[in-house]
C-alpha cells in the first residue's frame, strides 16, 4: 500500500516535454508540448517552412499539428512573432474546441493579428492552386474568421517579472534581442512540493551587431534553470558575422546604390521580410543617405504586410526608438505602396529607385514580380541581405550566376541582373556567442533545438566549453523522438 501511494505521488508531479514541431530537426516550425498529470501547454506553434514544395510543406505542417489535441491545451506561450513560431496557432481553433489562452509579450497583439491574417491569405491562395493542380480538396489551415476567433484568447503579459497564469503555471519573459518584442521565456511548473523551471530561448538576437538594431531590445542573459531548451540556428562555423563584416557590408550597400541608382539611373531590389527586416533596412538606408540633400532616389516599400507592420511599429515603439523610427519614416524619399495597381505602375517605371519588397527569400509576395522585371536587365541589381533556404528562388538566383535563365513560377527569365549577397545582417545569435551564453547557464541539461545537421558538431564543442568551466551540464541534440522527463 505504501509503495502504491509513492507511485501515485510520483506520477502526479511528473512533467513531460516533447519537441513535436519541425524545430526538433530543422530551423522552422517551433512547437514544444509540456504535459503534467492534469494539464497540457504549448510553447509556440509555428509553421514549417522547409525547402520543399508548397504541398510538401502543407503536409508536413498538418502531420505535426495532428499530434496536438486542441481541447487539451490550456495555454500557448509565445516567445516572438515570426511565422515559424506562431503561424499554426489558429489551426488549433479551426480544428476543434480549443479554449487555450495565448500568452504573448506586452504590445504584441497588433503584429500577431497582421501575421496571422497574412498567413491565412497566403495559405488559402496556395490551397486553391494545389487543389486545381492535383484535383483534390485540401482544406486551408484556417481562414480569416478563425484568426479573429483566436485573437479573442490572446493575453499580453509584462516582461522581467514572474506572472502566475494558473496554480500550476507561471512564466517570466526576458529580452532575447532577436526582433522587436522577442523574448526568452522561463516557464515555472509547480509540482506541489517543488517547482521546476524550464528556459526556452525562442530565437536569440545577434549580440555582435545589436547596437545597430535600433528598434530591438538588447539581449539579456538568464542565469539558471532546471533544463534549458535552446536554439542553434546559426551554429555552423561557416555562418558567422562580426562587426567588421557588418561595416564592410554597410559600405557595400552605399557603393551599390550610388553606382546603380545615382550614377546609372537604375534599380536596386532588396528582397526583405516584412517583420523586422524591412524597418531595419529602411533605417540603414536613412542613416546612409537621409542627410544628403542631393540624394533624390525614391525608396519604395512595396509590400502590404510590411506597410501594415510599419504602422504597428509606430504604435508600439516608445521614447528614443519611436523618435528614430518616425525620423526614418518621414524621410522625403520614402514611398509606401499599398494598392496592386500602384505596384504595377512602379514596376513598369524603369527609372532609378531602391525597392524593399517581401518576401526575403522570394517565395511569395510582390518581390517576385519585381524580380521578374529586374532579373533580365543587366543594368539593374538585386541586393540580398539575408539567409535563403535551399531551392527557394532567392537561393537559385544567388547560386545560378552561370545559368542563362532562371525559372520563376514555371517560366524562364533571362539571368542578367547584377547580384550581391551580403551575409552580416543576421538577426540570430552567432555560434561563439551561443557557446558563451549557454555555458554560463546553471542547469542540469541543455537541449539544442531549431538547428540543422551542424548542431551535432556544435553539441560537442559546447560540451567541451562547459567542461572547461568545470561544470557537469549535459547537452542533448534533440531529434524528433526526443522526450524529456522532469
Task: Give the label of every model feature segment.
Residues 443-448:
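Proline-aspartate-enriched helix->loop->beta-strand connector
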Residues 406-434:
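Generic long, charged, amphipathic alpha-helical segments
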Residues 457-483:
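Short acidic, glycine/proline-enriched helix-loop-strand junctions
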Residues 253-393, 449:
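Hard-cation-handling environments
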Residues 1-7:
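Short, Lys/Arg-enriched N-terminal segments with co-localized hydrophobic residues
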Residues 9-77, 82, 86, 93-280, ...:
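His/Asp/Glu-rich metal-coordinating catalytic cores
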Residues 365-371, 426-441:
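A short, acidic, amphipathic alpha-helical segment used as a generic capping/interface helix at domain edges
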Residues 34-37, 188-190, 215-220, 284-291, ...:
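Short, solvent-exposed amphipathic alpha-helical segments in soluble enzyme
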Amino acid at each position: 500500500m505504501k509503495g502504491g501511494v509513492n507511485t501515485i505521488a510520483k506520477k502526479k508531479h511528473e512533467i513531460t516535454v516533447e519537441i513535436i514541431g519541425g524545430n526538433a530537426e530543422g530551423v522552422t516550425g517551433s512547437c514544444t508540448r509540456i504535459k503534467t498529470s492534469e494539464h497540457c501547454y504549448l510553447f509556440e506553434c509555428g509553421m514549417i517552412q522547409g525547402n520543399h514544395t508548397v504541398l510538401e510543406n502543407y503536409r508536413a505542417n498538418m502531420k505535426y499539428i495532428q499530434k496536438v489535441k486542441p481541447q487539451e491545451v490550456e495555454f500557448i506561450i509565445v516567445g516572438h512573432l515570426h511565422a515559424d513560431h506562431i503561424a499554426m496557432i489558429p489551426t488549433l481553433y479551426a480544428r476543434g474546441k480549443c479554449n487555450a489562452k495565448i500568452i504573448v509579450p506586452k504590445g504584441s497583439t497588433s503584429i500577431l493579428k497582421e501575421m496571422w491574417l497574412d498567413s491565412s491569405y497566403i495559405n488559402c491562395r496556395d490551397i486553391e492552386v494545389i487543389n486545381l493542380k492535383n484535383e483534390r480538396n485540401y482544406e486551408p489551415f484556417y481562414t480569416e474568421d478563425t484568426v479573429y476567433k483566436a485573437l479573442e484568447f490572446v493575453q499580453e503579459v509584462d516582461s522581467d517579472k514572474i506572472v502566475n497564469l494558473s496554480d500550476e503555471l507561471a512564466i517570466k519573459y526576458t529580452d532575447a534581442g532577436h526582433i522587436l518584442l522577442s523574448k526568452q521565456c522561463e516557464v515555472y511548473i509547480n509540482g506541489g512540493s517543488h517547482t521546476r523551471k524550464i528556459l526556452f530561448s525562442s530565437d536569440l538576437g545577434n549580440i555582435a551587431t545589436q547596437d545597430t538594431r535600433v528598434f530591438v531590445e538588447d539581449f539579456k542573459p538568464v542565469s539558471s534553470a532546471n533544463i534549458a531548451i535552446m536554439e542553434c540556428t546559426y551554429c555552423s562555423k561557416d555562418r558567422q558575422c562580426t562587426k567588421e563584416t557588418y561595416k564592410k557590408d554597410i559600405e557595400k550597400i552605399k557603393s551599390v546604390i550610388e553606382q546603380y541608382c545615382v550614377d546609372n539611373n537604375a534599380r536596386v531590389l532588396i528582397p526583405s521580410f516584412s517583420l523586422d527586416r524591412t524597418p531595419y533596412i529602411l533605417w540603414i538606408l536613412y542613416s546612409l543617405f537621409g542627410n544628403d540633400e542631393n540624394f533624390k532616389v525614391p525608396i519604395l516599400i512595396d509590400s502590404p504586410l510590411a506597410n501594415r507592420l510599419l504602422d504597428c511599429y509606430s504604435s508600439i515603439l516608445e521614447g528614443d526608438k519611436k523618435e528614430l523610427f518616425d525620423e526614418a519614416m518621414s524621410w522625403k524619399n520614402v514611398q509606401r505602396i499599398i494598392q496592386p495597381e500602384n505596384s504595377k505602375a512602379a514596376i513598369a517605371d524603369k527609372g532609378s529607385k531602391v525597392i524593399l519588397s517581401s518576401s526575403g527569400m522570394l517565395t511569395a509576395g510582390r518581390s517576385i514580380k519585381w524580380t521578374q522585371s529586374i532579373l533580365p536587365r543587366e543594368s539593374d541589381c538585386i541586393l540580398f541581405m539575408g539567409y535563403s533556404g535551399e531551392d527557394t528562388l532567392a537561393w537559385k538566383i544567388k547560386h545560378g550566376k552561370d545559368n542563362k535563365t532562371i525559372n520563376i513560377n514555371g517560366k524562364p527569365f533571362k539571368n542578367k541582373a547584377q547580384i550581391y549577397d551580403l551575409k552580416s545582417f543576421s538577426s540570430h545569435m552567432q555560434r561563439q556567442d551561443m557557446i558563451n551564453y549557454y555555458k554560463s547557464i546553471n542547469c542540469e541539461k541543455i537541449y539544442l533545438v531549431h538547428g540543422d545537421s551542424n548542431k551535432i558538431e556544435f553539441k560537442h564543442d559546447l560540451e567541451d566549453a562547459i567542461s572547461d568551466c568545470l561544470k557537469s551540464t549535459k547537452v542533448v541534440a534533440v531529434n524528433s523522438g526526443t522526450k524529456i522527463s522532469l
